[in-house]
Amino acid sequence: MIFSAITADLDNTALAARFGAGPRLYDPVLAAERWAGWLADLAPEQADAIAALGNAFPDLQIALQSIAEASPYLFDLIRGDPVRLLRVLRGAPEQRLAKLLEDAETFVAAASAEDEVMAALRRLKAEAALLIALCDIGGIWPVMQVTQALTDLAGRSVQMALRFLLRQEAGRGRIVPPNPDCPEQGSGLIVLAMGKMGAGELNYSSDIDLIVFYELDAPTLAPDIEPQPFFVRVTQGLSRILQQRRGDGYVFRVDLRLRPDPASTPVALSTVSALDYYEREGRTWERAAMIKARPCAGDLVAGDALLSEIAPFVWRKHLDFAALSDVHDMKRQMQTYRGQTEIAVEGHNVKVGRGGIREIEFFAQTQQLIAGGRHPELRVRPTLEALEILAARNWITLQARDELTEAYLFLRKVEHRVQMIADEQTHALPDTVEAIEQFSRFLGYDSRDSFARDLLGYLERVQGHYAKLFEGDPTGTAKLPPVDYGAGPEDTRLLDHLLSLGYKKPLMIATTLQQWMTGGYRVLKVETTQRAFREFVPALIEELARAEQPDDAVNAFDRLLQALHRGGRLISLLSQNRELLTLVALVLGAAPRLGDMLARQPQILDGLIDPRFFGAMPDQAELSARLAVTLADAGSYEEFLDRLRLFGQESLFLIGTRILSGTVPTQQAAVAFADVAEGIVGTVHGLVSEQFASTYGRVKGQQTAILAMGKLGSREMTASSDLDLILIYDFDDDQPDSDGERSLHGAQYFARFTQRLISAFTTRTNYGVLYDVDMRLRPSGRAGPVASRLDAFAAYQEQEAWTWEHLALTRARVISAPPEFRSRIEQVIRAVLTRQRDAAIIANDVAEMRRAIAQEKGEDDVWDLKYAAGGMVDIDFIAQYLQLVHAHEAPDILHVNTLSALDNATRLGLLAQADAEVLRPAARLYQNLTQILRLCVSEKFNPDTAGDDLLRVMVRAGDAPDFSSLQARVKETQSDVRAIFSRLIGGEDA
């Protein structure tokens, strides 16, 4: 009776009745138990109603259980309001969404307080997000209807918030609108939706990209009101209403950084300034961005007029060489972003990875830029519509249109499903096979392999079409006649040729080439090498011309040649492998640290031609195996140390090169740096133990362990990280003297051993040093012994250590020790970290430490990513503070890695989700940029003097359109992080 009563009023338009075959269950038993467990906690009438719908519609039941299993975000929406779930399932989704928007507009129109508006918009977002997700998961709406619904939701939310703010300003007498109910009309305030929002293609957890402009002679402004402060204040209010994190969530994250020069301009710009900027300084990527621009709120008439004025900037009537070169440069920059990453499944980024969504969008937008000036029909916003018109006008084949369209729809669906898991703006697939197995089921596949087959097929087809976009030589240089590269700076034909390739200093390059071709360097004295090199020079010059700074690349290669004693094999390698040469050019141009390493040890290039180079990063087991091979036949202790240094430098070079080329995520690189260091530390530990014992013998019952602290402990190392180490030992008290020819007493033995260990790392040989070692984190720092006995270490941590030492201990990790001794040390550390603490005392100590660091290091330099206010130190302190305060009652919070500790704190409810969604992306941004800066900059980073190649690599690492946008993002991020630090820990003047 209950079942029939509940379902009798449903018709076939109801969302519940329209579910088709959707997700599959990864663990059906666990999923069913989780769903049933939630139902059991509900009021009986609610539980019965939801259960009846599930029983009546089996596909719906599986989808709901799949959400419980795979999507914490959607399951939270469901659990947060069972009545909302019933309301969504029982109605027709098209009518329900329209009613939601209508009701919200009615409520906001009557609201008198900003808090009421914020609450109403968040209620709207929560129900609409659940409804749209269910329509996507259940196959009720095709993917582009889903994106349009998300776009409509965003656009109406922006308009509602803006209308409220302008109504408030009208009430204060600052504007006099002709229509008080629609105060935006005739206001001269223009809100442009950019990117996917502009094209009606918004993804599930997307930021909304907006640019706000205003007319200087805004007709509705009161006479005494200055336009800029007024419109900036309104824009800030708009951003606050939409994106401020509260207990009831947020509406949309707002990104205002696509405006002209965002690092130095206010959040709202006059149309006069905008037009002047686009005319004088507008870049090709900004032209591409404007293809999708659409007035979405504010004065729509003024918005359309502004786009008409901007149109000549976007749509050029004639395609000159410079424009074509810009388009080609956009493609090169994107290739640099992707590096040479293989198409993959685990961890693949379906937006910017090979064969991804960005390549489809770029494929369409590039040809729109090229032809849209003469063919107005190409001036459309949606990607699929552009592909359709390009095919109809024979710019692309019907096959290209069909394959790219099908791939786009598939990849957008995958992207949505990834984002539904945790409502994060991510585009990367899970990075383990097990996680992909579960994700595949959530997407409706029966296995990881069946999903992988489809995914790889689409990615490969997209990549194939994308690769053909600039088939041949777009600059026309291949058609130039051959020249004499050794003719010198007097040969005008050579100079013209170098200019045509893009060199800015042809006289200097011609002089360098003349030196090469006459065999003036040691490496070129051998006739066969010189002959091979001469044949190779034209290809070399053409390839180096593709570098970001071609003249600097030639100079760097020249330094490499001068440093070589014997280089025939290197010349041969580069002549036969153009991809290798491109990579070497990037290294030489952007990372002097790596370039110097290459000049000293050219044999490290061998690693770049290993097929494994562009595959997965080697794990610890593989690194250990490689290290064992490197050391296998070393004959002496000194040779062991030399080979260790060579192994370390080659590993650093290979990881650094992968960071530069964009072929490994920087977080994986950080782990790889740590794995290399850990493998070397373990090897040195064993080697020094044996070598030391041969002279001094051993102490009865002796055990030694190396405790990694800092970046090695947390596995967050960079190319320039030193090793923060503590040596811990123990032995039998009844026989404290060693049994060697030169006997030492207990503590003296281990102190001498530790000094020998440090020397093995820091002694400079022909191959440099292994690592700088810092032992100041040991008990009592420099004043204490260099090695600590375990009981003394435990007593110090328990009775004497300062709060900062316990903060540092959250990163402590035993990396070399016998298993039983390792366990004893870990027990000591865990006991210290999980003891009960006074939160107020810890917060005060942390705030005081932050103030002291600010006084010593300063915190005003935005690009000091570690120490700036709101920088990485703030995030580290937050993670460490949460661990010390909460580990007593929630020991699962503990983790040596900052991001993992934040994840644990969020999962355990000890860090608000809203704060986590600021801190985690901030930490990733800082780590991404820090990896680049540690590779490429030895002194303080100054963007005003940095080379364009470095700036481009940083822009790529920060996933920004240009450096100005990146700088604006860093500033905004630091402000947000500092606000959280001040709220959680205090010390607003920290």
UniProtKB/Swiss-Prot annotation:
Residues 478-990 are annotated as: Adenylyl transferase. Keywords: ATP-binding, Magnesium, Multifunctional enzyme, Nucleotide-binding, Nucleotidyltransferase, Transferase. Residues 1-474 are annotated as: Adenylyl removase. The keyword Phosphoprotein does not apply. It catalyses: [glutamine synthetase]-O(4)-(5'-adenylyl)-L-tyrosine + phosphate = [glutamine synthetase]-L-tyrosine + ADP; [glutamine synthetase]-L-tyrosine + ATP = [glutamine synthetase]-O(4)-(5'-adenylyl)-L-tyrosine + diphosphate. It comes from the Bacteria. One of its GO terms (molecular function) is ATP binding. GO terms for biological process: regulation of glutamine family amino acid metabolic process. It holds the Pfam family GlnE. InterPro entries: GlnE, GlnE_rpt_dom, NT_sf, PII_UdlTrfase/GS_AdlTrfase. Signal peptide: none annotated. It is an enzyme of class 2 (transferase). GO terms for cellular component: cytosol. NCBIfam families: PRK11072.1, PRK14108.1. Belongs to the GlnE family. Involved in the regulation of glutamine synthetase GlnA, a key enzyme in the process to assimilate ammonia. When cellular nitrogen levels are high, the C-terminal adenylyl transferase (AT) inactivates GlnA by covalent transfer of an adenylyl group from ATP to specific tyrosine residue of GlnA, thus reducing its activity. Conversely, when nitrogen levels are low, the N-terminal adenylyl removase (AR) activates GlnA by removing the adenylyl group by phosphorolysis, increasing its activity. This is Bifunctional glutamine synthetase adenylyltransferase/adenylyl-removing enzyme. It comes from Rhodopseudomonas palustris (strain ATCC BAA-98 / CGA009). The gene is glnE.
